[in-house]
Amino acid sequence: MLLTLRRWLLGGGTPPATTDVATPSDAAPLTLESTGIDAPLDFAAILSATPDWPVPDWQQVQAWALSAPDPGLQGHAWSLAEKAWLAHMRLALGPHYRLTQHEQSLLLSCLEPNVADATVRFMTKTLARIERVLDGVAQPSPWGSDILIVFQDPETYYRYAARYYADDGEFALSSGMHIHFGCSHFIVQQDDLRLIEPVIAHEMTHGCLAHLAIPAWLNEGLAVNTEQRLRPPVASVHTPHELDGMHRRFWTEALIQEFWSGHSFLRPDEGNLLSYDLARMLTARMALDWERFRDFVLSADLADAGQSAARQSLGVDLGALVCALFDFGPAERWRPDPGRWDHEPERGAFQRTFLTQSPGLHRVPCGETTTCGLK
């Protein structure tokens, strides 16, 4: 991984230096003061008493930051709170974790210093590339930093993720998640460093789409295609022929409504992998004409899974697109039908719940992404 990151980032010139954010045992702040805000924030008082993980009341943090007189000072106050929270997280995780910063990217990990340095630089570079690939669609958050927490082991990773996951039992395995609750951040596992690069690209794409109320399938389709555009996938665990057969056997007129509503992405079975792959294929096909596709993305509404926007901007029926992929039909039985959805639709990068990725997600073959309209 380190060689790849260095090759991406250090190919020309000397990059800006990274910074180790000092976090000795007594450095987790209990009170925050910021320019332009009269009253300090009692940070200790708003930290939750949740076992294991210190999490502040982010609504109170936001109210405090908004009391600053201008947007620049508001963003500065929010950034102070982010670093304060990560300092408390570092203490909770243990002294082997360290906080590293490069421009607006923050990394909390126990990676070796040179790997942490390359990773945080990769985050900064990736953000710029996402903005170019998703021209006119991507919009980085105006507040705060891009935050990545790399957990040393799967047990700690899932124990942390469980705090944000609905108490509904089994959930899909994952390599990384975008936690879009309170302070938006990304989490990944350290076990397989080869997976960190695509996970960073995937999750940072979600962060750049957070301003759009788009359906989950489009959110995930954009993230997977952008990930593969920036970091080509490794060998697939399934051949294209095998995947095609899996799709044809799995999807039914009833299950496709789970896909359109976003709930199939939360399945713990093969439906999770197939949902990401179907989203990838649909997005790649629709993005061939970027100008029209961009209009579609900006107007797509999760309430109808983007059906109306697809007709208006692209002149296509979503049900017909699925039928064309797998020889299903008739199209009207496969298009989004919100009246048949059992739950409220999901946006993707799941708010309050989280993005789930099957172990095979990052090994899905690139397929049409080499010819899709992603720039």
Residues covered by each model-derived region:
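N-terminal low-structure segments adjacent to metalloprotease catalytic domains
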Residues: 1-100, 326-375
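Intrinsic-disorder-associated interaction segments
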Residues: 32, 36-39, 47-54, 71, ...
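Short, charge-rich amphipathic segments
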Residues: 45-68, 128-130, 158-159, 210-217, ...
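Charge-dense, low-complexity intrinsically disordered segments
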Residues: 72-76, 110-117, 273
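Short hydrophobic/aromatic segments of transmembrane alpha-helices and their interfaces
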Residues: 81, 89-91, 188-189, 206-207, ...
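Juxtacatalytic substrate-recognition/specificity segment
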Residues: 94-215, 305-313
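Acidic/His/Gly-enriched intrinsically disordered linker/tail segments
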Residues: 167-184, 195, 213-366
